[in-house]
């Protein structure tokens, strides 16, 4: 019974953390690849994320030898370069 309570509390904690911190996505550039930040700073990623209409961003390392820009408060459609560009420039919508 105690194991079940511990598992339940851990599950609730994970849900609460995801609600507080929200989802984050890595944006795609015009070549359909992620923005790498191996030699860049968090400020570079923050600017990239603002271009994708996100609230902010930073450089994260999701795997060994890989550093990607990760955006907070970004819509899935805006994670793609041309999707965000079309929202900013309505004349591009052909």
Curated annotation (Swiss-Prot):
<feature type="site" description="Important for blocking potassium channels">
    <location>
        <position position="47"/>
    </location>
</feature>
<dbReference type="GO" id="GO:0019871">
    <property type="term" value="F:sodium channel inhibitor activity"/>
</dbReference>
<feature type="disulfide bond">
    <location>
        <begin position="49"/>
        <end position="71"/>
    </location>
</feature>
<dbReference type="GO" id="GO:0006695">
    <property type="term" value="P:cholesterol biosynthetic process"/>
</dbReference>
<keyword id="KW-0738">Voltage-gated sodium channel impairing toxin</keyword>
<feature type="signal peptide">
    <location>
        <begin position="1"/>
        <end position="22"/>
    </location>
</feature>
<protein>
    <recommendedName>
        <fullName>HMG-CoA reductase inhibitor bumarsin</fullName>
    </recommendedName>
</protein>
<dbReference type="InterPro" id="IPR036574">
    <property type="entry name" value="Scorpion_toxin-like_sf"/>
</dbReference>
<feature type="site" description="Important for blocking potassium channels">
    <location>
        <position position="44"/>
    </location>
</feature>
<keyword id="KW-0528">Neurotoxin</keyword>
<keyword id="KW-1213">G-protein coupled receptor impairing toxin</keyword>
<keyword id="KW-0444">Lipid biosynthesis</keyword>
<keyword id="KW-0800">Toxin</keyword>
<comment type="function">
    <text>The heterodimer non-edited LVP1 induces lipolysis in rat adipocytes. Induction of lipolysis by LVP1 appears to be mediated through the beta-2 adrenergic receptor pathway (ADRB2).</text>
</comment>
<keyword id="KW-0152">Cholesterol biosynthesis</keyword>
<keyword id="KW-1207">Sterol metabolism</keyword>
<keyword id="KW-1015">Disulfide bond</keyword>
<keyword id="KW-1220">Voltage-gated potassium channel impairing toxin</keyword>
<dbReference type="GO" id="GO:0005576">
    <property type="term" value="C:extracellular region"/>
</dbReference>
<keyword id="KW-0872">Ion channel impairing toxin</keyword>
<keyword id="KW-0632">Potassium channel impairing toxin</keyword>
<feature type="disulfide bond">
    <location>
        <begin position="45"/>
        <end position="69"/>
    </location>
</feature>
<keyword id="KW-0752">Steroid biosynthesis</keyword>
<feature type="disulfide bond">
    <location>
        <begin position="37"/>
        <end position="59"/>
    </location>
</feature>
<dbReference type="InterPro" id="IPR044062">
    <property type="entry name" value="LCN-type_CS_alpha_beta_dom"/>
</dbReference>
<keyword id="KW-0753">Steroid metabolism</keyword>
<keyword id="KW-0964">Secreted</keyword>
<comment type="subunit">
    <text>Homodimer; disulfide-linked or monomer (edited version) or heterodimer of an alpha chain (AC Q6WJF5) and this beta chain (non-edited version).</text>
</comment>
<comment type="function">
    <text>The homodimer inhibits HMG-CoA reductase (HMGCR) (32% of inhibition produced by 0.6 uM), a glycoprotein involved in the control of cholesterol biosynthesis. The inhibitory effects of bumarsin are seen at much lower concentrations (0.6 uM) than that for statins such as atorvastatin (5 mM) and simvastatin (10 uM). In addition to inhibition of HMG-CoA reductase, this protein lowers cholesterol levels by inducing steroid hormone synthesis via StAR, and by increasing reverse cholesterol transport mediated by the induction of ABCA1 and APOA1.</text>
</comment>
<dbReference type="GO" id="GO:0090729">
    <property type="term" value="F:toxin activity"/>
</dbReference>
<dbReference type="InterPro" id="IPR002061">
    <property type="entry name" value="Scorpion_toxinL/defensin"/>
</dbReference>
<keyword id="KW-0153">Cholesterol metabolism</keyword>
<feature type="domain" description="LCN-type CS-alpha/beta">
    <location>
        <begin position="23"/>
        <end position="90"/>
    </location>
</feature>
<keyword id="KW-0443">Lipid metabolism</keyword>
<keyword id="KW-0756">Sterol biosynthesis</keyword>
<keyword id="KW-0732">Signal</keyword>
<comment type="similarity">
    <text>Belongs to the long (3 C-C) scorpion toxin superfamily.</text>
</comment>
<dbReference type="Pfam" id="PF00537">
    <property type="entry name" value="Toxin_3"/>
</dbReference>
<dbReference type="GO" id="GO:0015459">
    <property type="term" value="F:potassium channel regulator activity"/>
</dbReference>
